[in-house]
From Swiss-Prot:
Cofactor: Mg(2+)
Active-site residues annotated for this sequence: D78 (proton acceptor)
Amino-acid positions noted as binding substrate in the UniProt annotation, renumbered to this chain: S17, N18, N19, P20, G21, K22, S79, F164, G165, Y166, D167, K187, H192, R193
GO molecular function annotations of the record: dITP diphosphatase activity; ITP diphosphatase activity; metal ion binding; nucleotide binding; ribonucleoside triphosphate phosphatase activity; XTP diphosphatase activity
Disulfide bonds: none
Protein name: dITP/XTP pyrophosphatase
Domain of life of the organism encoding this protein: Bacteria
Annotated residues for binding of Mg(2+): D49, D78
Keywords associated with the record: Hydrolase, Magnesium, Metal-binding, Nucleotide metabolism, Nucleotide-binding
Cofactor binding: number and manner: Binds 1 Mg(2+) ion per subunit.
One GO cellular component term noted in the UniProt record for this chain: cytosol
């Protein structure tokens, strides 16, 4: 009679992203629940379209796409930076903020465009927002949904070498640092994605 190795009992969930920063955050938190995160690129899955106007619709579309392509449970996030003074922009277009204005698609271009848009704006309040969607299968009628919000403000000069996206310009008064100045452990304890992930991980028993 054969005996399964301890690793054989570990579940696998496809991450509907190939972003290295996201992969590190997801892998660290899901590992505490005995779950291995596999980026969709390793399984030959292409990026899904994100045509929707809300974070939750985009997250669900990405999760269903990855699950349909692999036959495995899948998790996706749709996250963005929201600036109330800019009517919630960049919002769902955070990754393509500068590109939508005819500029290149890059973190540097996005950050430069954001600072430019806020040049004459006194209210620099902002928040990172994250919605996570986990589907057991592609047509799951009851996906697990979790969300997280991280409050801060936008600063003109970039600070810090960690993180990605808008992190160098996202200052968190409660921590006295930008998101990019936080080491990964500190960010994983405080960020919007961390809050959403912790809420989702707490419910993982529902998919066993």
């Amino acid at each position: 009679m054969s005996h399964a190795s301890p690793d054989a009992a570990r579940s696998r969930i496809v991450l509907a992203s190939n972003n290295p920063g996201k992969l590190r955050e997801f892998a660290a938190l899901f590992s505490t629940a005995g779950i291995d995160i596999v980026p969709q690129g390793e399984l030959g899955v292409s990026e899904a379209d994100e045509p929707h106007a809300t974070f939750v619709e985009n997250a669900l579309a990405k999760a269903r796409h990855a699950s349909r392509a692999t036959g495995l449970p899948a998790v996706a996030d749709d996250s963005g930076l929201c600036v109330p003074a800019l009517l919630g922009a960049p919002g769902v277009y955070s990754a393509r903020y500068a590109q939508r204005a005819g500029r290149e698609k890059s973190d540097a271009a996005n950050n430069a465009y954001l600072v430019e848009q806020l040049r004459e704006v006194a209210d620099r309040r902002a928040y990172y927002y994250c919605v996570l969607a986990l589907v057991r299968h592609a047509d799951d009628p009851e996906p697990l949904i979790a969300e997280g919000r991280w409050a801060g403000e936008i600063v003109d000069a970039p600070r810090g070498a960690h993180g990605f996206g808008y992190d160098p310009h996202f200052f968190v008064p409660a921590l006295g640092a930008t998101a990019a100045e936080l080491d990964p452990a500190a960010k994983n304890a405080a960020s919007h994605r961390a809050l959403a992930l912790k809420a989702l991980v707490a419910r993982l028993g529902e998919i066993r």
